[in-house]
């Protein structure tokens, strides 16, 4: 297996995505076709809230997949960012959603 280093160009690509989109979900698959249960749950939460979000399919780009883990110092996918700030994965999203906190952040 080849090791992928998180390069400055990968970090710059991630920062560009975050700068251009207020709500970003780095996920496995797309919002139309999630490829894992956690990504499906994260997508469903955001769709239920009715917020527009930008999805990034990490399965299509190994550099982004590894780079986003390093960028946010978070080991798993999906990862939700709101206004360039890492919120967390699907478990944290669900907890915040059930408490009404995620809806407040997305107003």
Language-model features and meaning:
Residues 7-11, 61-65, 99:
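Structural motif corresponding to alpha-helix initiation and N-cap regions
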Residues 50-65:
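Thiol-based oxidoreductase modules, predominantly thioredoxin-like and allied folds used
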Residues 3-10, 77, 86-87, 91:
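Thiol/selenol-based redox catalytic cores and closely related redox-interacting motifs
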Residues 26, 79-83:
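Acidic beta-strand-to-loop metal/phosphate-binding motif
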Residues 82-107:
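Non-catalytic, surface beta->alpha helical segment in thiol-disulfide oxidoreductase systems
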Residues 15-52:
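Local sequence-structure signature of Cys/Sec-based thiol-disulfide redox active-site neighborhoods
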Residues 70-76:
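Thiol/disulfide oxidoreductase modules built on the thioredoxin-like
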């Amino acid at each position: 297996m080849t090791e992928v280093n998180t390069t400055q160009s990968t970090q710059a690509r991630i920062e560009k995505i975050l700068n251009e989109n207020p709500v970003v979900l780095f996920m496995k698959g797309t919002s139309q076709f999630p490829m894992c249960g956690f990504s499906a749950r994260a997508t469903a939460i955001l769709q239920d809230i009715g917020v527009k979000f930008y999805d990034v399919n990490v399965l299509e780009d190994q550099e982004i997949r590894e780079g986003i883990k390093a960028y946010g110092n978070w080991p798993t996918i999906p990862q939700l960012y709101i206004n360039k700030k890492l919120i967390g994965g699907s478990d944290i999203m669900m907890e915040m959603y059930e408490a009404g906190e995620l809806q407040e952040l997305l107003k």
